[in-house]
Amino acid sequence: MPSLIDIRRRIRSVKNTQQITKAMKMVSAAKLRRAQDRTIAARPYGTLLRKVLGNVAAAVANDESAAENPLLARREERRILLVVITGDKGLAGAFNTNLIKAASRFVAEHSGEQITFELIGRKGRDYFRKREVAVSGEAIGLAAKVKYEDTAAIARRAMELFRNQEIDAVYLVYNEFKSVVSQKLTLSRVLPAELPEQANPVDYIFEEPPADMLNILLPKYVEMEFYRALLESAASEHAARMTAMDSATSNAAEMIDKLTLYMNRVRQASITKEIIEVVSGAAAAE
């Protein structure tokens, strides 16, 4: 049976841990609020860009020159670029583990193809480095402050590889932010690009040929998909960490209560034992 000193030391240790998890929860909540605002603010731009692109696509539906855009070229998927967006830190529940499992499952399902990785986030990078997979590029620290320029550079590199036919498809693996308690694991193909369809396309009057407009908008659309994915992932990571730290704080409180109850029982048993010894000694003296 542990002594009272050992139990008190254990309670003190759990309380210290509880303070850390509570502080991390508060920090994650503040970061989540900012990341959530940026994610929600970016969604209307992405929606409008898809709408405009859909209208342009309708205008060039019968234009053969538009169909020649290299970002629309469909080929047999023999060489695939898999962009995996994980977090830079742990203590976020199953956030990083689920992403890594999804990427590994994708590789297993495409065992006949050549998979090259683009790794965004320290956790994914560290995991796949040990597996000695083919890596096209790495990026660490982007989620701390998501910038369009950083994600656009990665998107441009992927588009360049696709245009040069060094790869046949580009897939993104990330967590889409739904709510504080819900993040959706998402696997989406961004290249070859698929033009959005408009149910009721607007008949715009274009100053430039629609095919030229398509050539301008399509790369922006791909860049926006990368940017949106990283924004969604950053918000999801903070939400997952906040939830995990809230759960850890609650578990610590329960453990402290149980240890305190156990300590009181041990102390009561010790006092009872001492009383019995005193009474027994007095009885023996008589």
From Swiss-Prot:
Please identify the protein, giving its name as recorded. ATP synthase gamma chain
| Any one cellular-component term (Gene Ontology) | plasma membrane
Tell me, in a sentence or two, what this protein's role is: Produces ATP from ADP in the presence of a proton gradient across the membrane. The gamma chain is believed to be important in regulating ATPase activity and the flow of protons through the CF(0) complex.
Record localization: Cell inner membrane
Identify the domain of life. Bacteria
PANTHER family, alphabetized: ATP SYNTHASE GAMMA CHAIN (PTHR11693), ATP SYNTHASE SUBUNIT GAMMA, MITOCHONDRIAL (PTHR11693:SF22)
Entry's NCBIfam families? Answer: ATPsyn_F1gamma (TIGR01146)
Q: Which Pfam families match?
A: ATP-synt (PF00231)
Cited SUPFAM superfamilies: ATP synthase (F1-ATPase), gamma subunit
Q: From the UniProt record, which GO molecular function terms apply? A: ATP binding; proton-transporting ATP synthase activity, rotational mechanism
Please give the start and end residues of each transmembrane region. Answer: none
Task: Report membrane topology.
Answer: Peripheral membrane protein
Q: How does it assemble?
A: F-type ATPases have 2 components, CF(1) - the catalytic core - and CF(0) - the membrane proton channel. CF(1) has five subunits: alpha(3), beta(3), gamma(1), delta(1), epsilon(1). CF(0) has three main subunits: a, b and c.
Q: Which UniProt keywords apply?
A: ATP synthesis, Cell inner membrane, Cell membrane, CF(1), Hydrogen ion transport, Ion transport, Membrane, Transport
Which cysteine pairs are joined by S-S bonds?
A: none
Species source reads Solibacter usitatus (strain Ellin6076)
Q: Would the keyword NAD turn up in this protein's UniProt record?
A: no
CDD domains for this protein? F1-ATPase_gamma
